[in-house]
């Protein structure tokens, strides 16, 4: 009898182990928060570069102008003057005199009231501030971008961005200590990307038709505190008149979970995307 009880106990324990083992095998890794939060930060940080590039490269001389959504202003003084801000065209048509006094700062100011961007969905407030020791058109010259109370819809974006032009259509972008928050949740984001303008360069005064591709990698921490890393495997495609990345793929690895392949679609401007992990494909929204 005693031997029978022992055998029964062993059988029950073995059965429990087997059941638990089967249960673990059928668990689905469907964590989407890291994928969504990377997109929330990445899409807007990367969208800043073509806006800055459009204004910096194509600005003839120095003047304060409306830039569709926002106002472009130089924050500095021409050589030999004390003018703090330039509101009209100056005699220094090529702007070289501004750089005689050292680094020059510019601002794209969306104000506190804000305005609607070309995608029809992104409402912007705050300031994008640029600081550069040389003209924007100079290659291999790092330009520092600081975000001041910069908000898109209800999300505030902060951090520093270093942009370096490699050629007429290509820049590298490094996001340092990037942070995205709506006051209820917080996301950390850093990354180094190469951005190439593949559309809109023939219309220098029209931001609405700009199109860029993005390659590179990033890391961050999602709103639930889980860290993640990413690597773009097929260039991401972003139109300035679309809020979302519309095509391309990347690999994202949340801490403690399997690497998933994120697919942003085939080019349609929408917030639909998928990720595949362990052979299973899951749909999600880029919000």
Regions found by a protein language model. Name each.
Residues 24-287:
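Low-complexity, intrinsically disordered segments exposed to solvent
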Residues 2-3, 23-25:
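Basic side chains
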Residues 17-21:
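C-terminal motif of bacterial Sec signal peptides marking the signal peptidase cleavage site
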């Amino acid at each position: 009898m005693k031997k029978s009880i022992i055998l029964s106990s062993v059988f029950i324990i073995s059965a429990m182990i087997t059941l638990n083992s089967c249960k673990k095998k059928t668990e689905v890794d469907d964590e989407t928060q890291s994928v969504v939060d990377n997109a929330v930060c990445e899409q807007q940080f990367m969208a800043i570069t073509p806006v800055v590039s459009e204004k910096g490269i194509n600005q003839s001389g120095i003047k304060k102008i409306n830039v569709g959504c926002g106002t472009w202003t130089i924050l500095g003084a021409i050589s030999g003057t004390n003018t703090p801000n330039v509101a009209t065209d100056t005699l220094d048509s090529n702007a070289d005199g501004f750089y005689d006094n050292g680094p020059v700062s510019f601002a794209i100011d969306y104000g506190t009231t804000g305005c609607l961007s070309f995608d029809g969905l992104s409402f912007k407030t705050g300031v994008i501030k640029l600081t550069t020791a040389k003209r924007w058109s100079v290659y291999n010259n790092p330009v520092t971008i600081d975000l001041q109370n910069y908000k898109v819809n209800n999300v505030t974006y902060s951090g520093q961005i270093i942009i370096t032009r490699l050629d007429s259509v290509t820049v590298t972008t490094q996001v340092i200590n990037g942070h995205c928050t709506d006051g209820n949740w917080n996301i950390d984001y850093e990354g180094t990307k190469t951005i190439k303008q593949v559309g809109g360069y023939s219309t220098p005064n029209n931001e609405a038709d700009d199109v860029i591709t993005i390659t590179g990698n990033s890391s961050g921490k999602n709103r639930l505190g889980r860290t993640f890393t990413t690597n773009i495997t097929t260039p991401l495609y972003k139109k300035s008149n679309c809020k979302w990345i519309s095509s391309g793929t990347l690999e994202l690895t949340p801490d403690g979970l399997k690497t998933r392949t994120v697919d942003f679609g085939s080019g349609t401007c929408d917030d639909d995307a998928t990720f595949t992990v362990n052979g299973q494909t899951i749909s999600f929204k880029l919000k």
